[in-house]
């Protein structure tokens, strides 16, 4: 069953390779959530202010991986960044992504 889904939707994103190639992890949770635990080296830009930070993120010129608690807010942030022409991936939960890298 899972091999069928992989064939249908393609292979998953290789987040480890993206990070090794220089991708930036942006954690879009609140500062309080971020302080409670986060991926080492990630940047905290809450989803409610990410629109204001688009120009600065774009200037970095690197792919972005967004994370949050469950994947919902990181999905919203992905949409904002993608519409600005930034190469972006939704890493989902910060805890889940941390276990993949």
Where are these regions (language model features)?
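Rhodanese-like catalytic fold shared by cysteine-dependent sulfurtransferases
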Residues: 2-21, 31-63, 72-101
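Short hydrophobic beta-strand that contains or immediately precedes a catalytic carboxylate
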Residues: 24-28
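Short cysteine clusters
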Residues: 68
């Amino acid at each position: 069953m899972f091999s069928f889904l992989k064939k249908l939707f393609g292979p998953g994103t290789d987040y480890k390779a993206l990070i090794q190639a220089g991708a930036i992890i942006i954690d879009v949770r609140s500062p309080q959530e971020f302080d409670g635990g986060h991926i080492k080296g990630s940047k905290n830009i809450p989803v409610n202010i990410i629109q204001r930070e688009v120009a600065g993120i774009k200037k970095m010129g690197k792919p972005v991986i967004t994370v949050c608690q469950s994947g919902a807010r990181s999905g919203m942030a992905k949409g904002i960044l993608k519409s600005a022409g930034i190469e972006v991936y939704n890493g989902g939960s910060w805890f889940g992504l941390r276990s993949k890298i």
